[in-house]
Amino acid sequence: MITRYSRPDAAAIWSQETKYKIWFEIEAHAATKMAELGVIPQAAADAIWAKGKDATFDADRIDEIERTTKHDVIAFLTHVAEIVGEEARFLHQGMTSSDVLDTCFAVQLARSSDLLIEGVDRVLAALETRAKEHKYTPTVGRSHGIHAEPVTFGLKLAGYHAEFQRAKRRLITAKEEIATCAISGAVGTFANVDPAVEAYVAEQMGLQVEPVSTQVIPRDRHAAFFAALGVVASSIERLAVEIRHLQRTEVLEAEEFFDKGQKGSSAMPHKRNPILTENLTGLARLVRSAVTPAMENVALWHERDISHSSVERGIGPDATIHLDFALQRLAGVIERLNVYPENMQKNLDRLGGLVHSQRVMLALTQAGVSREAAYAAVQENAMKVWRGEGAFLDFLKADDRVTLPHDQLEALFDLGYHTKNVDVVFRRVFGEG
């Protein structure tokens, strides 16, 4: 986890303090149910809660113990015993370290999911506001990076809004799949712990019961979770790259906000660089880097091994914290994005009407010209424009193969033709015109 790219709320989920608090809650809730089942004395369960619920667990002391035990959960339980006293012997009855570690990991990922969903909601709100603001702002659509046909800037943003709606659904599904609890004991047979304990702990921790845990929660769940994060990161990158392209000097249709006092270059005082969206492109790579290791964690040996552990200690906090940061940064960029409709119009006009070539070709075919002949006539005149020899409309009017009346030809260059169905798309995306 890189502090520079983290928010306090997201980082706090992965702090040692939070982790040990969750570990204690799992152990204490298990003790509560065991007391109800008569496995341990009720007085012991009460004492565990009374002495431990407000305790501050000393990470340095736990690390000190672990240097001897070489086992983090045992080190934690030893430290808890120092706080709770004699009743601590009733903790962890019939449980394994994976019961604690995997359930805690599920809690942390679920809580992180809530922040990520909040981040997507902010992105969605920003996109909706800006899309409606520029619903009819004409701009050029590009394919292969080359001018194609007119669109509206609002329509472009509506497409991203639809994509982030899907991102939200993916995160909700990912949370549902990862939010599972396993308190099943060695090799997952419940031989030494009643299944009712697992059900109770799951309920208290806001999780679902893992149907079959083999001492660990199956890692296909985690693979799906991190894959979902990777897709969301790619959606962030797609919009970030779009903004970066639109900010290029020769395009300049949109631009990141540039605050008073901000500097763009240590050498060139004139620079206004798209540093935030460049940063988002890099963060997306970091988040996606978690996907392959998560996939490789699925194939554990038999009922369990710990080859996944070192991986998850890294990708859990890193991927969630960085994605949380990226979503909030992206929302801020959209909210404050400088949009330049006048430059959009200049770029639309730059090729002298070539963006209307398809409409001219279709009009010719409807007037009785074969598609092949219509394509050839339009393309030949378009190539003259590419070479800077004149205006597209003038060439078309002078071409005997173009049999359309001049007033009809001129009408084909109307931008409104390309925006006539914007309302339809907006209703699909936003549920309104």
Predicted regions: what they are:
Residues M1-S184, F190, D194-Y200, V209, ...:
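A helix-coil-helix interface module used to build multimeric assemblies
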Residues M1-T18, A55, T68, A75, ...:
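Catalytic-core signal marking the mid-to-C-terminal active-site face
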Residues A30-K33, L116, V120-V123, L127-R130, ...:
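Amphipathic alpha-helices that form helix-helix packing interfaces
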Residues A31-T32, Q108-V120, L229-R238, I243, ...:
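Alpha-helical support elements that line or immediately flank enzyme active sites
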Residues D102, L109, S113, L157, ...:
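Amphipathic alpha-helical coiled-coil segments and their boundaries
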Residues L155, A223-V231, R359-A367:
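Short, well-ordered beta-strand elements within core beta-sheets of diverse protein domains
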Residues T189, Q204, V209-V216, Q345, ...:
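A structural signal for small-residue-enriched, beta-sheet-centric alpha/beta enzyme cores
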Residues E198-V291:
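Acidic, glycine-rich loop-and-beta core segments that form the ion-binding/anion-interacting portion
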